[in-house]
Amino acid sequence: VKIGGRVISEYSRSYFIADIAANDDGDINRAYHLIELAKEAGADAAKFQNFKAKTIVSKNGFESLGSQLSHQSSWKKSVFDTYQDASLPDEWSERLKRKCDEVGIEYMTSPYDFDSVDHADQYVNAYKIGSGDITWIEILEYIARKKKPVLLATGAANLEDVKRAIQTLRKYNDQVILMQCNTNYTASELNFSYINLNVLKTYQKLYPECILGLSDHTFGHTTVLGAYMLGARVFEKHFTDDNDREGPDHKFSMNPLTWK
């Protein structure tokens, strides 16, 4: 699989994605700074997200969950308001892409609706599909038809979900990177008990031609080392400059020191 100028294979050096996501805290200058830090730390790509709060979360649905909320229960704002704050203005994309080109790092994003896919297409060489969309067949087809490499996260999916998603993507596109993922964002040490890296063995047997990867939300790099030994070559970790900042992703993110 080729992303930009990098060919990724079982025998190539690993490909590292610094997921800046919401860690810019709504400030494009912080985003620029994090791009620079990610490059200095050795990341191959800096990743963002394109979504609108009203199309990615149900305000009423999350409010009705109350105490059943998982990692969102620790957020100081409501789920809807947090996503509203984390959504990037469309006009940022060109500027972020330009900054990535300037420092020599791949610009990447996860689009979460059809309009966002079309918006991102002019800026990206590959698409990342988040775990939450693995059963949304229409968006999988839409992205696959763009004929660019696809990184598919499989958190919270069962094996039938994964098989269906791979079958859907491959109808139009054989450039698929299959990524194990844990979807708990609490930064709790208990998350290491649910990372299930052994599923990479299953993926390798089912799809020996696929590049494997890990989209990870645990802190540190223990899971990266384990996944590498099981065949993963693409790694995505959240990235920040300060783990003590207020926000949903800072606590479990890598920083420039731990990334190196």
What are these regions (language model features)?
Residues 1-260:
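Catalytic cores and adjacent flexible loops of soluble metabolic enzymes
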